[in-house]
Swiss-Prot record:
Polar residues bias spans: 1671-1684, 1800-1818
Coiled-coil boundaries: none
Residue stretches of biased makeup (Basic and acidic residues): 206-219, 242-265, 281-291, 332-347, 785-818
Name of the molecule in the record: Protein virilizer
Keyword Nucleus: yes
A GO BP annotation: RNA splicing, via transesterification reactions
Biased composition (Low complexity): 1732-1742
Entry keyword Nucleus: yes
Region feature (Disordered): 206-364, 783-818, 1557-1584, 1666-1686, 1715-1782, 1798-1849
Protein family according to the UniProt entry: Belongs to the vir family.
Subunit structure: Component of the WMM complex, a N6-methyltransferase complex composed of a catalytic subcomplex, named MAC, and of an associated subcomplex, named MACOM. The MAC subcomplex is composed of Ime4/Mettl3 and Mettl14. The MACOM subcomplex is composed of fl(2)d, Flacc/Xio, Hakai, vir, and, in some cases of nito. Part of a complex containing fl(2)d, Sxl and vir.
Chief localization: nucleus
Species name: Drosophila pseudoobscura pseudoobscura (Fruit fly)
Subcellular location: Nucleus
Taxonomic placement: Eukaryota, Metazoa, Ecdysozoa, Arthropoda, Hexapoda
Length: 1849
């Protein structure tokens, strides 16, 4: 494809569409200024075009793939020409020729005509704007006022209202476009679709077609506009006959639908309809009159809730105006048009003398008077439009949790539930009239009532129970109706009490004449007590006014002899329901009733299991009530009863106990909501057993338990308790805070929690959201009531629609004022504190779900109103639709739609709209397809649920209806039909008979097998089939000890495993990995809907595979040896790693990664008994396969990240509150690490090779991740830390020796790599054990070098940092609570004592040999300061200073002289710190297991150090000189250094008092040390207390002993910053931007010749161009290079035409992969579920004929059973590209040998870990720097106190 000219710009980009291709089609493109056309490009079907504004992605829609296209232009250089000039002929072929070059002859033109056999065409026109024609072109007049005949009776004010109060915002102001007709086709055109406007207006205002003279005036106006270059459309045919309004409306609509695809798409006058955007699309409502929209960012972008339609880009969503500047971007059309118009007006050119492009039937007239009026009106009208566009809100009503306030819908419940209230009143009225139930006595009287009246009581009571049961299905509805019913009339309360007493009377039941009615009477009473007993008002009335105890009455019936089991269970259910209220629980637990003891007695005497189960549910419900009450009490005790202003230095034991109670209560509540939900219910016909095939759920029992939970939440103010805990995290332990977050997550996953937060605790919910998001205050906005517009985002649409045309001037004023308030405020609230990611995610989830409930409530109330307000419904549905445009908002919104049967709201709306359409068709013309925004939005939301909802409860409930809806898509208008056609592909698996039946899943497996062919085209049916299979095969996660285990899921897993399900799933994974081969280069594609589809396939596939593998390995234990899946799992992880961090499928990607890790951990299940089996264990083999797959630059970082995910995180862990849990966790943590170490030991060689290959890497992110993995490995056990230490030591020594003892860049990298590892306690202990020998000789020789180039300097700095860690006793495996001898602990934290003098000498020599201003000097002084911390090291340092006093004084003189003569430097502060450390003893830390320091230098010794012996005595003293320097540079000097210096001067001045003491004698020990550690001081004084005697240092213990004594737990704080206690620190690669904070060079520039590298690494016969195209998926099908089509798409996101027979897209991708698919064997029957293929088959798999021919061609001889042994690696790579699936189908189920790889790790070790940097840095995110400050700057290091939450995910 040739490029356009350098000066060419994009003049036009759009899509023309026609109904059919039975005739030649014509289209016209007009330009408002003369242009030279240089090139025309046709965009093939599915090709992506990216504009340079955000979200500007378009898809080509050209159809068919081949046709001839002619281009004609109006030559402005030949004004008298009678015909168009032929520009050229393009023989379009989407695989070859797609552009026409017109740059040879430049013809000035203002129009381009297309002529060809096509149905849809997407084209881009490039050219040059010009004014250089033979005659100047007249300036275009302003467009005429586009008022058609339907707008005649609209007043100016009402017209302004309709145009200004828009809901969809235009990003640029633009005049109303005028549609142009194709010359050969005459249709009726209107600038507005007024039939849609009148849909929202009342009938009495629709008088648009009554005056023929007004129509004629408009016709003349349209004709006159043809004089200008604006090219207004020709007039419609004159219609003088009368007609009805409905027929006129239909005629306009039908003609517009046909003609809209044929109108020309000029850049200025583009179509203003969008058939795809639900906010703009096909309105038959009052919001149709919108002007053209800004091309939104929602087209095939991350905010789209579903795949866009290709045919939808031919309207305003894809409108791309020609450019007025050199850049290749789109420009605001209003700016360009106004600038052009102004330029031409200033030029003053005469009237146009060239012939414009006119239609054949256009008539040119001139009425000068009317024309002047029209121009003025058009100018005024355009100004009004610009103002309306400026104030209009955005098209997508995005919900921003940080800016927008949460809303709650307060509808008129009394009106909404009036029908239920009237029904209840009617039933009680019947009871009072037809039965005499005033009292139990009267009813029980034998002669009081007739038999008919008694039976009538049963009939009417059962009807009442049915109505009450309907009310109880919704907690809010039940409470409101009963409260209104009992509050408004006390007679109702008395009557209900009487009826309930009669129903519960055993005597009254016995008075029933027939036995059946006796039973029905008792059941009626039990059911009525269950339904009415939960009302606290009625319960209190019975108890206080009538002294009637409901519990006593029900339990007395329970105690009656010979009571049937079913009635007993019904009575227990009534007792259960009556415990919903606080009054009921108090009465039940009162001494009078003593209900708890009574239930316990029943439990002891009960013989039937079902009775015991019902009784224990009552007990558990009471316990849950008590737990929630304790939460309220504990929060009051912590936050109200205590003085929070008093800081607590030590945790209060009482407070810890209180917080532990809160944790236990929250755990019980989460258990009740998830795992043990069934045990808290009273399900019907449920027999509790340990295992059962299927547990049938009881919706009534679930609703009853949900109502009880919500009632308990309200009674105990759960939201307030959550608020005070979340807002005061420092007042509670971190485990309590994290438990609170877990409870919030659990509540938001259930409809009970969402209903509670919205209906019962909304003000508190607002504050919780503010706390979670870190906002200073709750965004304020008045609550919305039904009579007012719902929120500021809804005001424009509501007002614009509800406004009537006759409201006059007030309407116009209100229209001008209110849009200014419509946009939400953009000022962000200040963030009080850094918000943790988990808190922010939780706040966003809560915001979206509460807001979704608000809109659902509004839709429900509005749809139920007598007046069906479509505008209001569409407004709220548009808001929900807007929420789905954001990935996180879409996820949370869809979750709410899938809960509690909320999708029924949209299904009912669709049914209602269908009925309305049928009525319209009966009244007007049958067969006409009407457009409705409500219907479009409802279908969109159902479609979003089908596409994105992972929970399938909605599908079980509405699947059949949705399938029928999708099948009948042709009955809807085109835009809705397009959505339903795509939805039909998703619903295809539901056509199988009983797809949700567990008995036989083979139809589902067949659907998945067939869908493999469309894996990368439109995989809707595959996604849905995998979701259904996951629903059948995987049970909900629950603890084994809870409830009944369902066997149906295991049964499905067995069926799938027997049907080669593992191979089928691996085939899916392989095809995806093959399609995204080298996934790093596919990052842009993974950002789009392709990535979403890939994750939607991958997630259920991985979950099902994990279930199958876990179950198979669990059953076969050590005999399972199949490693086939590991390769594919690792490749899938590599693909997932390269997803961009902010992609649409971010949450799903993280879930998929976790599933891969869990699947690999399933291989760790078998238990080996001996060492020999340990080396061949499945665990060890899994690790080997993972390590082998880290075999290339693209795999290094994701491979190490996967290894880090698999390994346990380093100790210590956060400490739990409970001591019992602490002991259990301690044993588990230790055993887990020992097992990992044992299974990794056989792979020690491979681990060492990996470290050797990657450690010298110049890529800092890779080195940093490898450091963390090495830390994880070394934390497991002593053998692993010795392995890592020896590997690094060998690397350092080998590198130094091979370079002839000259430091190299590679050595510098290795030393820098080792620096951080030596600061890790386990690795430090092993390094110290091997320090003696060549390792120390390396350090010594490096420090002795006097060449100070950059490499040597960096090496010496790294050595100093390593020695810093070695000498720091804070870095140690010893716990601060150790009870061992302090000197023994010290010996374990220091290098061997014989090396310490040599280390001191080497450091001091290096210090005196380097420049005093060098960084090495400060590091060396730092090490000398560390040596003063303990007596042993201090002694040897003092001895060295005594021996080398001259050198020390010379170095000191150089430091002082530099600061005196040159400039101030920090080295003088280092000198002061060293002198202070020598003369003063720091107070020991409060908790320390090391011996305290007792030795220091006195005044005489200090004088000997600082007084020069061989220098002129006339010079001032050293300390005075230093003081003078600090005073001179007071602004730069450190105040602490100045204070230390003054103390030194005072000490030096006191030397006269110590003249009598001996030289270098140590003074007495400080008193604080005496008190701190008397034992240490005594031992020092006993040894003489002198620097002449070396302190005692014992031999260090072994590494094994140190490991046993290391701390397992540490304390932490939820809000403190300690990243090492978070999982993110260990598992996320460090962002590349933070590397320089770790004293690492950001980049190393390493010379590399890519050509030479390619010649070395690649096969000379490799076709680089073809392989690159194949890898980049530039071909539509990877079948062969001959069929590669550079433009065909993969993962199509447009609308697909469904084949009637198969329901599949017409185009197929993998045609050649039908053979060798792996389904040759028939599936096993149900009776043979446990049959599987044996490990060794007698008939080996055959070699494919194509592969055999390929082997013969390259001269290889097939050997072995398959001939695969000799296949060259490059040929194997091409086989993968052919994608025949033979790698999977040829492998047996229990393959013993692993296939050879294209690349091996050995090929990468030679390069020394060269510079590799990923092509995409956006996915390198997520972790804090380890060295947020230099690790030697502070003293709190090592294994001290930690304060951070546990390993947060």
């Amino acid at each position: 494809m040739t490029e356009v000219d350098d000066g060419a710009e994009l003049l036009f980009f759009d899509t023309f569409s026609h109904e059919d291709i039975t005739d030649i089609n014509l289209d016209l493109v007009q330009f408002p200024k003369p242009v030279f056309i240089t090139q025309v490009r046709i965009i093939p079907l599915g090709a992506r075009v990216q504009a340079d504004f955000p979200g500007g992605v378009r898809l080509g829609a050209t159809n068919p793939s081949k046709f001839d296209l002619e281009f004609f232009v109006n030559d402005l250089g030949m004004p008298g020409a009678s015909a168009f000039e032929n520009l050229g002929l393009l023989r379009y072929n989407q695989n070859d020729c797609i552009h026409l070059d017109c740059s040879r002859e430049k013809i000035p033109t203002d129009g381009l005509v297309l002529r060809g056999w096509y149905s849809t065409i997407t084209l881009a026109v490039y050219g040059i704007l010009t004014n250089s024609v033979t005659q100047p072109i007249a300036s275009p007049t302003l467009p005429c006022e586009p008022a058609g005949p339907e707008m005649c009776n609209l007043s100016t004010e009402a017209h302004n209202v309709l145009l200004q109060e828009e809901v969809l915002k235009d990003d640029w102001a633009e005049p109303i476009p005028t549609e142009l007709l194709v010359p050969h086709k005459a249709v009726v055109v209107s600038d507005y679709e007024h039939d849609d406007i009148e849909y929202g207006l009342s009938r009495e205002h629709q008088h648009y077609h009554q005056h023929v003279d007004e129509e004629q005036r408009e016709m003349r106006r349209l004709r006159r506009s043809t004089h200008s270059t604006d090219r207004s459309p020709p007039p419609p045919p004159m219609r003088t006959h009368t007609h009805s309004e409905s027929n006129e409306r239909e005629y306009i609509r039908c003609s517009r639908d046909k003609g809209s695809r044929d109108w020309s798409r000029s850049p200025e006058y583009s179509s203003h309809r969008s058939r795809r955007k639900r906010s703009d699309r096909s309105r038959s409502d009052a919001d149709e009159h919108k002007w053209p929209r800004t091309p939104p960012a929602s087209i095939d972008s991350p905010i789209r809730p579903r795949s866009p339609d290709a045919m939808d880009y031919d309207d305003d969503d894809s409108r791309s105006h020609y450019k007025m500047q050199a850049s290749r971007g789109y420009r605001h059309s209003s700016e360009s048009l106004h600038r052009d118009r102004d330029d031409e007006e200033r030029s003053g050119t005469p009237q146009e003398q060239f012939e414009p492009i006119l239609s054949d039937d256009e008539i040119i007239g001139d009425d000068e008077e009317d024309e002047a009026e029209d121009v003025a009106a058009a100018a005024e009208y355009e100004r009004e439009l610009e103002f309306a566009a400026a104030v209009a809100p955005p098209a997508i009503d995005a919900f921003e949790p940080w800016q927008r306030p949460l809303l709650v819908y307060e509808g008129d419940l009394a009106a909404h539930l009036n029908k239920e209230l009237e029904t209840l009143r009617l039933l009680f009225k019947k009871l009072s009239l037809q039965t005499r139930c005033e009292s139990v006595t009267a009813f029980s009287d034998e002669h009081g009532l007739s038999a008919d009246e008694r039976e009538q009581f049963v009939y009417l009571g059962e009807q009442l129970n049915n109505q009450l049961g309907y009310l109880s299905q919704h907690y809010k509805r039940r409470n409101f109706v009963l409260q209104q019913f009992f509050s408004h009339d006390d007679a109702h309360l008395r009557q209900a009490a009487n009826v309930l007493q009669v129903a519960l009377s055993f005597q009254a039941a016995c008075m029933q004449p027939q036995p059946a009615f006796k039973i029905r009477h008792i059941k009626l009473g039990a059911r009525m007590a269950e339904l009415l007993g939960s009302n606290e008002q009625l319960f209190g009335h019975l108890l206080q006014e009538q002294d009637f105890d409901l519990f006593e009455a029900v339990l007395s019936l329970y105690k009656e002899p010979y009571m049937a089991l079913s009635i007993k269970l019904q009575l227990l259910k009534a007792v259960y329901a009556m415990l919903d209220t606080r009054l009921g629980v108090q009465n039940f637990l009162s001494p009078k009733t003593n209900g708890y003891q009574m239930v316990m007695d029943f439990l002891k005497t009960a013989k039937l299991t079902r009775t015991k189960y019902a009784l224990q549910a009552i007990i558990k419900k009471l316990h849950l009530y008590e737990a929630l009450a304790s939460v309220q009490q504990c929060c009051r005790q912590i936050f109200l009863d205590t003085d929070a202003s008093v800081p607590e230095t030590t945790p209060d034991p009482n407070r810890l106990d209180v917080c532990q109670k809160i944790e236990f209560a929250f755990q019980m509540l989460m258990d009740a909501l998830t795992d043990s939900q069934l045990s808290y219910q009273q399900p019907r016909r449920f027999l509790p057993v340990s295992k059962k095939f299927e547990v049938l759920t009881d919706p009534t029992a679930q609703r009853s338990f949900g109502n009880a939970l919500q009632s308990y939440f309200v009674q105990h103010s759960l939201a307030e308790a959550l608020l005070v805990i979340l807002s005061n995290p420092k007042e509670v332990p971190a485990s309590t805070f994290l438990c609170t977050l877990d409870l919030m997550h659990t509540l938001l996953r259930s409809h009970v929690g969402i209903d509670y937060f919205v209906d019962d605790a909304f003000p508190v919910t607002q504050m919780i959201v503010s706390i979670l998001l870190g906002l200073e205050e709750v965004p304020s906005q008045p609550r919305v009531v039904e009579a007012k517009p719902e929120g500021k985002e809804d005001k424009p649409m509501d007002d614009s629609v509800e406004q009537k045309p006759d409201e006059g001037k007030a309407a116009g004023i209100r229209a001008a004022e209110e849009p200014k308030m419509a946009p939400p405020p953009v000022v962000r609230k200040p963030i009080l504190r850094p918000v943790l990611p988990r808190l922010a995610r939780l706040g966003i989830e809560l915001s979206y779900k509460v807001q979704t409930r608000y809109h659902l409530d509004a839709i429900t109330f509005t749809a139920a109103c007598p007046e069906y307000d479509t505008i209001k419904i569409a407004t709220h549905m548009h808001s929900i639709y807007s929420q789905t445009c954001d990935p996180s908002g879409r996820q949370h919104t869809i979750e709410v739609l899938g809960l509690n049967n909320n999708l029924k709201i949209f299904m009912d709306l669709i049914k209602k709209e269908q009925r309305l359409q049928t009525q319209r068709q009966l009244l007007s013309s049958p067969g006409t397809k009407y457009k409705s925004p409500v219907l479009s939005y409802a279908v969109d939301m159902v479609d979003a649920c089908v596409r994105y909802c992972e929970q399938l409860d909605y599908l079980i409930e509405h699947g059949g209806v949705i399938l029928e809806l999708a099948k009948n898509h042709e009955t809807f208008e085109p835009s809705v039909s397009a959505v339903l056609q795509e939805m039909y592909v998703y619903m295809k698996p539901l056509e199988a008979i009983n797809v949700f039946v567990y008995d036989d899943i083979m139809p589902l497996v067949e659907v998945i097998g067939r869908s493999l062919d469309y894996l990368t085209t439109f995989p809707g049916d595959l996604i849905m089939a995998l979701r259904i299979l996951r629903f059948l095969a995987i049970s909900k996660p629950r603890q084994k000890s809870h409830g009944t285990e369902e066997l149906k899921h295991r049964f499905v897993a067995l069926q799938l495993y027997a049907a080669d399900g593992v191979q089928l799933l691996l085939q899916i994974m392989e095809r995806l990995c093959t399609h995204f081969e080298q996934p790093g280069i596919h990052a842009p594609a993974l950002m789009t809907i392709q990535g979403v589809h890939c994750c939607q396939i991958m997630l259920p596939t991985l979950q099902i595979l994990r279930e199958l593998l876990s179950y198979a390995i669990l059953c076969r234990d050590g005999t399972y040896k199949d490693l086939t899946a590991i390769d594919h799992l690792v490749k899938v992880y590599y693909l997932l790693y390269y997803y961009p961090s902010r992609c649409q499928a971010g949450a799903e990607v993280e879930q998929c990664k976790l599933e891969v890790v869990k699947s690999l951990l399933a291989y760790t299940q078998p238990h080996e008994q001996d060492a020999e089996s340990l080396h061949k264990s499945l665990w060890t083999l899994m690790v080997r396969e993972v390590l082998k797959n880290i075999d290339g630059p693209a795999h290094f970082i994701p491979g190490l990240k996967l290894l880090a995910e698999l390994l346990p995180l380093p100790l210590p862990m956060p400490q739990p509150l409970c001591d019992q849990l602490k002991q259990q966790h301690k044993q588990r943590l230790i055993i887990e690490r020992k097992l990992w170490s044992a299974h990794l030991h056989p792979q020690s060689g491979q681990i060492a090779k990996l470290v050797e290959a990657l450690a010298p890497s110049s890529f800092p992110q890779l080195a940093e991740l490898l450091q963390r993995v090495c830390m994880q490995l070394s934390d497991l056990a002593p053998n692993m830390t010795l392995l890592i230490a020896k590997t690094i030591t060998e690397l350092l020594c080998t590198e130094y020796q091979t370079s002839n003892c000259i430091p190299t860049t590679n050595l510098e990298r290795l030393l820098r790599f080792s620096t951080r590892l030596c600061a890790f306690a386990p690795l430090k202990s092993s390094m110290l054990s091997i320090l003696s020998g060549k390792f120390w000789e390396l350090f010594q020789s490096l420090l002795a070098l006097n060449e100070f180039n950059e490499v040597v300097t960096n090496c010496q700095e790294a050595v100093h940092r390593i020695l810093d860690s070695f000498l720091d006793s804070g870095i140690s495996l010893i716990s601060h609570k150790s009870t061992a001898q302090p000197a023994l602990n010290l010996s374990a934290a220091l290098p061997p004592k014989e090396l310490i003098p040599r280390i001191i000498d080497a450091v001091f020599s290096n210090l005196t040999s380097v420049e005093v201003t060098h960084g090495i000097s400060i590091l060396a002084v730092r090490n000398l300061v560390i040596l003063t911390e303990h007596d042993f090291t201090f002694y040897h340092l003092a001895q060295l200073l005594k021996q080398k006093l001259t050198e020390f004084q010379a170095w000191m003189e150089r430091v002082i002289l530099h600061n005196e003569t040159v400039e101030y430097h920090a080295n003088i502060e280092s000198l002061i710190l060293l002198l202070r450390s020598l003369t003063q003893i720091e107070p020991p830390p409060p908790m320390c297991a090391m011996p305290n320091r007792t030795l220091k230098l006195g005044a005489m010794e200090l004088a000997q150090l600082v007084e020069f012996q061989d220098i002129d005595m006339a010079r001032p003293p050293v300390l005075a000189r230093i003081l003078r320097v600090l005073e001179k540079y007071k602004l730069l000097a450190n105040e602490a250094a100045l204070c230390d210096l003054k103390q030194l001067i005072v000490l030096h001045a006191s030397r006269q008092e110590a003249m009598g003491s001996a030289s270098m004698e140590t003074p007495a020990v400080e008193t604080e040390n005496d008190g701190a550690n008397p034992a240490a001081s005594c031992s020092t004084s006993s040894s003489g207390g002198s620097l002449n005697v070396e302190p005692f240092l014992p031999q260090a213990e072994g590494i094994v002993t140190q490991y046993d004594a290391r701390p397992i737990f540490t304390r932490y704080c939820a809000t403190a910053e300690n990243p090492q206690l978070t999982a993110r620190y260990w598992l996320e690669p460090l962002p590349i931007e933070l590397i320089e904070d770790m004293n690492e060079p950001l980049y190393e520039r390493i010379a590399c010749d890519l050509t030479d590298l390619a010649n070395v690494c690649l096969n000379p016969d490799l076709a680089t161009s073809g392989e690159s195209k194949r890898t980049l998926n530039l071909s539509g099908s990877p079948q062969s290079n001959r069929e590669m089509t550079p433009t065909a798409p993969c993962f199509r996101t447009r609308r697909v035409e469904v084949e009637p027979a198969t329901g599949r897209p017409e185009k197929k991708m993998f045609l050649s992969s039908v053979r060798g698919r792996g389904f040759a064997r028939p599936p096993p029957s149900r009776g043979d579920l446990f049959r599987s293929r044996p490990p060794n088959t007698s008939r080996p798999p055959s070699l494919h004929v194509d592969d055999f021919l390929a082997l013969e061609t390259c001269g290889a001889q097939p050997t072995g059973p398959t001939g695969y042994n000799k296949i060259p690696s490059m040929l194997r790579g091409s086989r993968v590209g052919r994608n025949r699936g033979s790698r999977i189908s040829a492998a047996a189920a229990f393959r013993q040998k692993k296939m050879m790889r294209i690349g091996s790790p050995s090929s990468w070790t030679e390069s020394g870990g060269g510079s590799y940097r990923s092509t995409s840095e956006s996915h390198f995110g997520g972790s804090d720097s380890h060295y947020s400050s230099p690790h030697y700057s502070g003293r709190s290091r090592g294994r001290g106190l930690r304060s951070r939450p546990p390993y947060l995910r």
